[in-house]
Amino acid sequence: LAIDPDSMSSLMASDCLQHYQLLLTRILRYRDHTLSPAEEQLLAMQAEMSGTANKTFRQLHDADLKFGFVENEKGEQVELGNATFSQLLISPNREVRKTAFHQYYDQFKAHENTLAATLCGSIQTDVYYARARGYESARTAAMFPDNMPATVYDNLITSVRNNFEPLHRYYDLRRRLM
C-alpha cells in the first residue's frame, strides 16, 4: 500500500506477479481506507478497548447466564445451556420443548438492559471504525472485504421481508401439530 499507484500498476503488469494478481488487487482495494502510520497506530492501540462489548456479551452468554434444569422426555433432569438447548428443542415431547424454549429465552429477557448496552457498544465501535477509515457507513465497511454492493444486501433484506408469511404459516402449523 505504501508503493505509489503508478509504480504498483507497472509491477502488477509484470509476468512475475501475474500469479498474485487477485491477491494484490484485493489488498490494493484498501488503499483509500488505510490511514497514515500514526493514525493506524492509534487505531491499533484501541483495538482491545473496542472489543469490550463483544467480550462482555461472551462472558454473559457463556459463563454468567444460568438456565437451570429441564426434565427431558425420559424424566431425567438435564442442565439447560448452550450445548443442550438445541437437543431439547427437538425432543418428541412438546412440553420439554416448550419449557426449554421459555426457560432459555427468559434469561435473555432478564438481562435485556445488559444485552442492549453491549449491542449499543458494538454498534458504536463499528460506526467509529467506519468513520475513521472513511467509509460511507458501518454497513459499507462491513461489506467491503467481500466486495459486496449495497444493492445485494438491500435485495436480500427486501426478499426476506416479502416472504415472511410462508415461514409464519409453517411455524404456526408446526406449533399446532407438535
Predicted regions and their residues:
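A well-structured
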Residues: L1-M178
